[in-house]
Amino acid sequence: MRPDAVTLCAVVRLAVFCDYSYRVEDGKLYAELPFALFLRQLGDHCKRLLLTGRLDPTPGRFPYLMEGVEYAPLPHYSSGAHLRGVLRAMPAGIASFWRTLADIDVVWVLGPNPPQALVFALLTLLRRRRLVLGVRQNLPQLIRHRHPGKVHLWLAALALEGAFRLLSRRVPVAVVGPDLALRYRKAKALHVVYVSLLGEERILTAAQDDRDYLADELRMLSVGRLDPEKNPLLLADVLARAARSDARWRLDVCGDGTLREALEQRLRELGVEDRALLHGHVPVDGGLWRLYRDAHMLVHVSFTEGVPQVLLEAFAARLPVVATAVGGVPALVDGCGLLVPPNDADAAAAALGELVGDQALRARFVDNASARVREHTLAAECRRLAAFLAGPA
């Protein structure tokens, strides 16, 4: 990072568009997903941070309080996959976004979904503001797994990503993980982000790791949405196979989504429902860290990923990792855990058994993981990203 980067960033007025929902209650802003906490920290490096996204009219709070952050609401629609709702919301959204640009220097537009992302990017250029694109996922791959058989959505995703990649040749892009960096390698300028919510104080030392792999129970932990692209039903199969070899295994699942009932049914079908606890969504500061500390392994079975935040959290907790080799996962996990093919319960169960039985391998992996996560703390990632967003001095 340039020596003057922090000073430069401190005078930048930054707006961020992301296709997330927010709620406002009693004058306070609440965010739907923990990525917003990363954005909140990014605001510490700017003169002004303004978030813009869907205002959910449903009463109640989302889990994450966004203190000290300005908010410009956009019309609500249920999902970027519901194109009619997206298009109905677009005229009012365009007018609101145009007004937002009046007192802004830099705009980070995360996309390529929904279509508004591309429109907002073009409006930013028309208003002669600095535009930086942001990409967190392989959209066509995500749509293929989340909406199987819906070819029109997959084609729309291909078109949106193609337009984003074409625009990226003219403007800088910040992507999550090396896999997406490869897809956007022809961008005018490229920065790789690791979305981390970890402070240095969260990273355990070897002396603080008191896990007992000879205990009466072994707990595997899964953290993530229970949606098709995350492949949560495989967790039941992994648990069943692992328990055949070692009856001590139990499963903790943190996350909610469309496949929760299907996962419960699959656990019953395999006769392992009494070995599993489905906790629902557990906020970062609402008990999730304790579950990392109490677990013996993290199991991550997604079909598609950028760089999962949960892997960094497991690294910080010195929790051994078994993960599918998809997206940006191999680059992050290399030397820090075991990789398995997607949708292969036998391979995942075998990897769990290998790690339980090899103390030296576990120690090497968690030591490497601890060193790696120190490179990607929340403060470090936000400093680097803020400097990139601000642009050349």
List each language-model region with its residue ranges.
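A short, active-site helix/loop in glycosyltransferases that binds the activated sugar's phosphate group
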Residues: 54-55, 157-207
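Short alpha-helical donor nucleotide-sugar binding micro-motif in glycosyltransferases
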Residues: 101, 281, 290-295
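A conserved mid-protein helix/loop that constitutes part of the nucleotide-sugar donor-binding site
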Residues: 218, 222-241, 258-264, 289, ...
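Aromatic "clamp/platform" in nucleotide-sugar-dependent glycosyltransferases that forms part
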Residues: 303
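Short acidic/histidine- and often glycine-rich active-site loop of Leloir-type glycosyltransferases
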Residues: 326-339
